[in-house]
Amino acid sequence: FQAASGNGDSGYGSFSIDAAGNWTYTLDDTNPAVDALNDGDPLSDSFTVYSEDGTPQLITISITGTNDAAIIAGTTSGAVDEDGADAPVTATGSLTASDVDNTANAFQAASGNGDSGYGSFSIDAAGNWTYTLDDTNPAVDALNDGDPLSDSFTVYSEDGTPQLITISITGTNDAAII
């Protein structure tokens, strides 16, 4: 074979071939068309190699897209005070998702209990989340002034990229019952 190197005909990567016919293709993941592929989307690239006598041979490369994880930013923690008269019993935040695979950049709307069971959460498709402390939970109600607990929940972008939200819970002084 005639040793050669260069870019594929579609420009999605580069190739090289040595005189023994061993060839290598390297995909350019930074190419916008390659980076934008959704999971399972196809592309192809090709290049022509030549034998020692000049006979051409077309080599075609099949490229299959994979899921790129979303980049999640925003409020990933919150704080609530147990049973305080002026203290919040909810924490709120907002997240954003940037995902080249899913242009909606949305979240999977969900609601449920926190991982430790001290409260409940909800998130909408726009990434707005709310955590509500359950002041009737025995572990929460038993907190002394300044005692800490934590709860957490996991939310997911449209493509399934997880993001952990952590909630700090602080005990307050409950008035005596007479």
Specify the residue positions occupied by each region the protein language model found.
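Acidic, turn/loop-rich segments in luminal/extracellular domains of secretory-pathway
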Residues: N7-T64, A85-D86, L95, G114-G171
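Extracellular ectodomain surface segments
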Residues: F1-G11, I71-G117, I177
